[in-house]
């Protein structure tokens, strides 16, 4: 039976870049754990801001966060109030100096993480899983995705036995290294249990072999 490698890790250094960019000899395990906690804290604080990616860079004891979001206004706030509050909360919790950069996502419909979270939200609101998948897939295709695949796993529609259902439209060449594949995962917490949602989006081929910045 064929197994799926993570499409992001598979392309690291080829046409994808690391989301944690730093080097350390002695403090490596501590930094990895701290990165995990920083992402968890930011995601929880900005759960309503449509965060797709949280990149972390470290240099000289300072931490630089690069947030990719569909709603930069919510992250920054009026006159930068919200972003200053977030910086203060991070400094207080992790005892480090933080700088935060915000990048706006122009087309959230083709960002796999946001698409997965959108489907999970629909499932929590009791929308039928097939309708949620088909609606989202057609929307992504309309906004320029060359291919998209969605899987939902769990007690779908309240069934006694958990199963996996999937829906695909267009090409999603997971084994082609030059293919720009975006991957996202989210969980829907329903009354019947947790439903896992995975999304793969094919955005075209990167022919010049450049690593994304």
Curated annotation (Swiss-Prot):
Disulfide bonds: none annotated. Residues 38-106 form the KH type-2 domain. Pfam families: KH_2, Ribosomal_S3_C. It comes from the Bacteria. GO terms for cellular component: cytosolic small ribosomal subunit. One of its GO terms (molecular function) is rRNA binding. One of its GO terms (biological process) is translation. InterPro entries: KH_dom (IPR004087), KH_dom-like_a/b (IPR015946), KH_dom_type_2 (IPR004044), KH_sf_prok-type (IPR009019), Ribosomal_S3_C_sf (IPR036419), Ribosomal_uS3_bac-typ (IPR005704), Ribosomal_uS3_C (IPR001351), Ribosomal_uS3_CS (IPR018280). Keywords: Ribonucleoprotein, Ribosomal protein, RNA-binding, rRNA-binding. Binds the lower part of the 30S subunit head. Binds mRNA in the 70S ribosome, positioning it for translation. Part of the 30S ribosomal subunit. Forms a tight complex with proteins S10 and S14. Belongs to the universal ribosomal protein uS3 family. This is Small ribosomal subunit protein uS3.
